[in-house]
Amino acid sequence: MKWSEISIHTTEEAVEAVSHILHEAGASGVAIEDPAELTKEREQQYGEIYALNPDEYPAEGVLIKAYFPQTDSLHETIAGVKSSIDVLPSYDIEIGTGNITVNEVNEEDWATAWKKYYHPVQISDTFTIVPTWEEYTPSSPDEKIIELDPGMAFGTGTHPTTTMCIRALEKTVQPGDNIIDVGTGSGVLSIAAAKLGASSVQAYDLDPVAVESAEMNVRLNKTDDIVSVGQNSLLEGIEGPVDLIVANLLAEIILLFPEDAARVVKSGGLFITSGIIAAKEKVISEALEKAGFTIEEVLRMEDWVAIIARNA
């Protein structure tokens, strides 16, 4: 089978939105090449070794590569992707050039080459995220492993917003907590919450591909006795109270449901949000406070923030 590599030149702010559009269009895998990875300072508190080749990164902006099987409808698929990307500026998301290029890739090349982008990454004191094909031995008895299959959808869960959400969960989840994960994607946050001692986690996503991906990853991590996955639009029709809600979504989506979050999370419960570019921290904080939340802590990583807020 022949494959097409669709490359989109965009901005760091648009990475999650463009990646989601590509997954929605049926991409069999997505890789992100961000030149900021070459120069950023790294904590290296877990003994990581980084081997990055500058020749594989664009001079500026971010390059997102997605892989589609060559079919008669590929041109229509690409046109649909372009149309969806062109709409993003109306949501105040800067897309940069938005240039799209297409290259042919042999199946045998695709089957192995894309895996070079994914390796075990220890993202916190507790968790290491490991691609399913990698063999990995925990460095201590307390280290927890989350296995993910990036080939299914939604990457490996190592984006700064996901990392901050997991670190926020480490700070806040108590044994026996009831939790809702809004916009679960790969299910990584729900899996983390279950491994931290939650007694029940409801994971929701509007995208049926995300639901399928999350269900697979939940089973893979043997947390399906705690995590239930379902299709739903944000918190529509969801009743509480729960101890904690976590949502790693675009800022524009988070702004749609602070009042619903305040309705569903118990008094004194927590709402953890990320997916927020730093420039939009203020507008999200104000919306949460207007809904009755108090901002307890703001986590920062690169150009992103995560907010831990407590309900009145």
Swiss-Prot record:
Name this protein carries in UniProt: Ribosomal protein L11 methyltransferase
HAMAP family tied to this protein: Methyltr_PrmA (MF_00735)
Gene Ontology MF: a single term: protein methyltransferase activity
Organism: Bacillus cereus (strain ATCC 14579 / DSM 31 / CCUG 7414 / JCM 2152 / NBRC 15305 / NCIMB 9373 / NCTC 2599 / NRRL B-3711)
Binding site for S-adenosyl-L-methionine: T162, G183, D205, N248
UniProt similarity note: Belongs to the methyltransferase superfamily. PrmA family.
GO cellular-component term (any): cytoplasm
Pfam families: PrmA
Superkingdom to which the source organism belongs: Bacteria
Cellular localisation: Cytoplasm
